[in-house]
Amino acid sequence: MTSVNKKEIEKFSKMASEWWDPEGKFKPLHKFNPIRIQYIKENITKNFKIKNKTKPLSGISVLDIGCGGGLLSEPMSRLGADVTGIDASDKNINIAKLHSKKNNLKINYLCSSPEKL
């Protein structure tokens, strides 16, 4: 059994170049992302009783499954987390790697599925 859906991979691979366009096909994710990041950050810091304000996720490992272009991975890294992002699309992983490199972020991106980890 696999969680990989080939049609979904093809669909998102075709849109890979648009991941970082806030007015493109991923506009809803860009609009929703700040709320999602805040929610994740608040829950991690609360549950792990973290007091560090500058890098509140320092020392935390994050696995972003289905990371796409890295819209969640990058903010988690900026907050101090050690991030691994996986996606079944090579194109998405390549976009994510290029974007994180431009922004001097150390994120481990892998073209993989959860079952292969």
Where are these regions (language model features)?
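Conserved alpha-helix/loop element of class I SAM-dependent methyltransferases that forms part
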Residues: 31-58
